Design a protein with these regions (language model features):
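N-terminal glycine/serine-rich phosphate-binding loop of ATP-dependent small-molecule kinases
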Residues: 1-97, 126, 233-241, 258, ...
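Active-site core segments that coordinate phosphate-bearing ligands/cofactors
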Residues: 6-8, 108, 115-179, 190-201, ...
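Active-site donor-binding loop signature of nucleotide-sugar glycosyltransferases
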Residues: 32-34, 219, 292, 470
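Short beta-strand-loop/turn "lid" adjacent to the catalytic site in phosphate-handling enzymes
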Residues: 64-101, 128-137, 170-193, 218, ...
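Structured loop/turn residues at beta-strand edges in well-structured enzyme cores
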Residues: 68-71, 212, 401
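Carbohydrate-associated surface elements
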Residues: 104
Length: 496
């Protein structure tokens, strides 16, 4: 009798369920989008009840659409959008307001007030590894407690649950029997003490959040409860393998040891490096977080995010009309004058890690009379690689771990020029994933490993779509990096 794992990937835009077989292969996928609720102030919300309904619907659909016997489902794993925050009543499971999405900055004023208090920003950063920001759930939870009367009332009555999306999905799947989150998601709340591995009473007190309102933190491969998918399965199955989406992708990419890193290229880019089993504080403003806790071992990561990766190509197409589709970029880059020294710094919304210049604006440097369409497109494409190199370089300096290999996924990885240039900059091989469902697969595989269906070798089941080796001479590489750094410094100086 065959056995299957369902990997639920609850993301910003919707919910997927992946059906994974005993060999670790993806058999089928079912999807459902959910509404993006944006008000006039630009606040971004999701309906928790809609997400809960979609979780159950896609998990059932992925079984029904394949004709798999529901009795053959062995377990369920979860990957989720991080930082999005849900408040609900413990006694009824009723959401008390819409979920505050990770993108939403409605808690900015509250966080600014906290940062103005002596020692609070330092306490938060030193304890949680994260810069005090409305991006994280701590500020969102504090905002909910101050602005949603039903939440404050529930807290006073000891009935309030405040959790990240993984906690809400676990609650949904277990019919309210379990209120748990995993270590990776806990580490992104800005309330978790990374060194001690528990909720921080002093940080929670600073934000006005009662620890009693927070979920029980459970090992990422631990047992989060059981589910029959609302009566769909003939018997309850265990929920194991719960991870934030970037952490699940890191796991699926096989970055299980110190010095291994992954970059997901999308509209922006998430860059994450496994720094081993000891906490590493960043001197470059990178986020220090937990990769996961599995097999009783806690592993840490450094993380940096790039705002404009694939979005640069969208800008070239939609705003400048220099290309008709992103696939043209590779050919244009190879056709450009190799002697071109044009640099483009895409600081459309400032520069993030490791530069942290929020007021910076996009700039172009080094144009000559011979600069044409191809040279400009090449500079824009290279800017993606330079930004990711900056984050990787900061990670290597912070951690002292040499980069052994960069593992990548996402649509822009199909750009051969970009991948070669990235490999040349980081000075290491780049391994390109052959499957785009890394987050959901990471959760499913982690669940299967916990159940004894797989070993960690399952991450190699798909192999690589390609491996790119660095080939640029060292002196040329150094010259290009120096030129980029000069361009970034000039951009920051110009807009300061």
């Amino acid at each position: 009798m065959s056995k299957y794992i369902i990997g639920i990937d609850q993301s910003t835009q919707g919910t997927k369920a992946l059906l994974v077989d005993e060999g670790g292969h993806l058999i089928h996928r079912a999807d459902r989008p959910h509404r993006q609720i944006v008000n006039e102030a630009g606040w971004v919300s999701h309906d928790p009840a809609e997400i809960a309904a979609n979780v159950l619907a896609v998990a059932r659909a992925v079984v029904e659409e394949t004709g798999v016997d529901p009795a053959d489902i062995a377990g369920i794993g979860i990957s989720n959008q991080r930082e999005t925050t849900v408040a609900w009543r413990r006694t009824t499971g009723e959401p008390l307001c819409d979920a505050v999405v990770w993108q939403c900055a409605r808690a900015r004023e509250l966080c600014d007030e906290l940062a103005a208090r002596e020692g609070v920003a330092e306490l938060v950063r030193d304890t949680t590894g994260l810069v005090l920001s409305p991006y994280y759930p701590a500020g969102k939870m504090a905002w909910i407690l101050e602005n949603v009367p039903a939440a404050a009332e529930a807290a006073a009555a000891g009935e309030l649950c405040l959790g990240t999306i993984d906690a809400w999905v676990v609650w949904t799947l277990t019919g309210g029997a379990e209120f748990r989150c995993d270590w990776s998601n806990a580490s992104r709340t800005q309330l978790f003490d990374l060194r001690r591995g528990c909720w921080s009473e002093p940080v929670c007190e600073a934000f006005g959040v009662d620890v009693a309102c927070l979920p029980q933190v459970t090992d990422s491969d631990g047992l989060f409860g059981t589910t029959d998918l609302g009566g769909f399965l003939p018997a309850p199955v265990p929920v194991h393998g719960v991870l934030g989406d970037s952490h699940a992708a890191l796991f699926a990419q096989g970055c299980h040891s110190r010095g291994m890193a992954k970059a997901t290229y999308g509209t922006g880019s998430s860059v994450m490096m496994n720094v081993g089993d000891e906490f590493v504080a960043s001197s470059h403003g990178l986020s220090s977080s937990l990769a996961w806790r599995m097999d009783g071992v806690t592993e840490y990561v450094l993380e940096g995010n790039v705002s404009y990766a694939g979005a640069v190509k969208t800008w070239l197409r939609d705003d400048l009309e220099l290309i008709n589709n992103p696939e043209e970029v590779t050919d244009l880059c190879y056709a450009a004058n190799p002697a071109s020294r044009v640099y483009f710094v895409p600081a459309f919304t400032g520069l993030g890690a490791p530069h942290w210049a929020s007021d910076a604006e996009g700039c172009v440097f080094g144009m000559t009379r011979t600069t044409g369409r191809a040279e400009f497109v090449k500079a824009a494409d290279e800017s993606i690689a330079y930004q990711i190199f900056d984050v990787i370089d900061a990670m290597v300096e912070d951690s002292g771990a040499a980069l052994s290999e960069l593992r990548v996924d996402g649509g822009p990885t199909r750009d051969a020029y970009l991948m070669q240039f990235e490999s040349d900059l980081v000075g290491s091989p780049i391994r390109i994933a052959s499957n785009d469902e890394m987050s959901g697969l990471g959760a499913a595989w982690a669940c299967g490993i916990a159940l004894g269906m797989y070993t960690r070798d399952v991450v190699d089941v798909y192999g690589a779509r390609g491996i790119v080796e660095p080939s640029m001479p060292a002196d040329e590489r150094a010259k290009k990096i120096a030129g980029w750094r000069h361009a970034v410094a000039a951009t920051i100086s110009y807009t300061a």
